[in-house]
Amino acid sequence: MAATAATTFSLSSSSSTSAAASKALKQSPKPSALNLGFLGSSSTIKACRSLKAARVLPSGANGGGSALSAQMVSAPSINTPSATTFDFDSSVFKKEKVTLSGHDEYIVRGGRNLFPLLPDAFKGIKQIGVIGWGSQAPAQAQNLKDSLTEAKSDVVVKIGLRKGSNSFAEARAAGFSEENGTLGDMWETISGSDLVLLLISDSAQADNYEKVFSHMKPNSILGLSHGFLLGHLQSLGQDFPKNISVIAVCPKGMGPSVRRLYVQGKEVNGAGINSSFAVHQDVDGRATDVALGWSIALGSPFTFATTLEQEYKSDIFGERGILLGAVHGIVECLFRRYTESGMSEDLAYKNTVECITGVISKTISTKGMLALYNSLSEEGKKDFQAAYSASYYPSMDILYECYEDVASGSEIRSVVLAGRRFYEKEGLPAFPMGKIDQTRMWKVGEKVRSVRPAGDLGPLYPFTAGVYVALMMAQIEILRKKGHSYSEIINESVIEAVDSLNPFMHARGVSFMVDNCSTTARLGSRKWAPRFDYILSQQALVAVDNGAPINQDLISNFLSDPVHEAIGVCAQLRPSVDISVTADADFVRPELRQA
């Protein structure tokens, strides 16, 4: 394939880059012409909008207020971030332009037919060091090894672990060994690798990054699957060494999903988990092709561009929101409501967890949120609207706070400190993460699943659908207002939820979903799930019980939101097979496997 011009990106200028990479970066904003979901008017936004919490005073009350009283007001003096086009060039892979609700973006479509191009993408790389063995590392290492073998490449994939790590046995069982040079000490592996994939936990990265940098060869490439380390460095006023390239490939799903869909798709071209990629520093012009090669080798159906900063903000936020924390809060809240209203426990579980992880997820994945709404009866639509109207702003209240905690570095600091509390220190005991599926609700779930017919997607309960979709749409709006691209918004708010994560809760409950994820995700889900549970119980459900009128503007804007068109385009790029997750799955974390 003929080489193109020097690699360029049209990315946000907020990311720090090396001098070499800075020359290749250019910002390419595209004027926004979207109805952003709050007020239904013309598609051209003539006045920017902002949130205002208006105080609603009940008769006889002296004051009060809540997220329910939030409303949109005209604020022409405030600049709304214009949409940014993420463009790039590759000398190896073909990019495609997709239009998402009026915004042009560029992707690389994956597939096993592209594996023969991997040797060109990894030119100059003799060893890929995969450091760690948590959620992502086992999946990525095995996928890389299998893809490179199929491509007849002589690039070595080597696992690097701490001396004495219990994960050595797991890595050996997956086909890596000291004898053939594919398994060893992490520091020796880092020193000997041309591409270092740092897939240890985020808190471990924060505590060990200086030693990692010191062991890397000049002109080698640091690969990340999360922008967390950049956020940590920014909080300290530090940056990456200038003599290495820094890239990221971030699968939009937990590690077990990355491996499972790759294996399922061996007979079907194009199965895997979508990924974003970023080039933060490029010291020799190879970074883009290496990043895209990495993503293709993982089996990503499509790969879209972002920045490390945009990635960590959307990812850390998303997993605390609809992906993990918020959905946990929703089902706990609604299970209590339904049982307290006289519904049987079995039916309440079906109308919450089974409903969301089954028919709701399946419909959104293949047809979108509008199709879900339109499948309801007229009475069902009324219940959906009541739940949606009451839940949207309370959900946005917590989501807004969460995003700002992530963007400010507060949530990153919380993760680092939590990781240090896993061990005894300062005379205080260790506090590892506890279990999250031991309450009555999740025991009921075990019983429901034990008699569930194969392939049963559960009932479609309109009220549950209204709450879930309201939170999903509120998350989309936060990310949209914060300037994220549609491909990132949809993957972090919709696709990852319904195609990667919810199937695990459907198979074996909330812990099976949450605890197969990264440490950062597991911590965030535990921290924020109770916040969503609380605000929905205290504000949304109370409003419904008090007969609060349905906000017809919210419903109208949901029905006409441009995100539906963008989701429709992305649905055409979904994996070629649906993930198959069973309760006895052997591709999950060892501690979560059934005996």
From Swiss-Prot:
Query: What positions does the domain KARI N-terminal Rossmann occupy?
Result: 108-306
What is the annotated quaternary arrangement, including any partners? Homodimer.
Domain called KARI C-terminal knotted: residue spans = 307-455, 456-592
Q: Where does NADP(+) bind?
A: 129-136, 162-167, 201-205
Q: What is the gene name?
A: AHRI
Q: What is this protein's record name?
A: Ketol-acid reductoisomerase, chloroplastic
GO biological process annotations for this chain's record?
A: isoleucine biosynthetic process; L-valine biosynthetic process
From the Swiss-Prot or TrEMBL record, state where the protein is found. Plastid, Chloroplast
Q: Does the keyword Metal-binding apply?
A: yes
What organism is this sequence from?
Answer: Spinacia oleracea (Spinach)
Catalysed transformations (reactions) = (2R)-2,3-dihydroxy-3-methylbutanoate + NADP(+) = (2S)-2-acetolactate + NADPH + H(+); (2R,3R)-2,3-dihydroxy-3-methylpentanoate + NADP(+) = (S)-2-ethyl-2-hydroxy-3-oxobutanoate + NADPH + H(+)
Residues involved in Mg(2+) 1 binding: D315, E319
Q: Quote the cofactor binding remark.
A: Binds 2 magnesium ions per subunit.
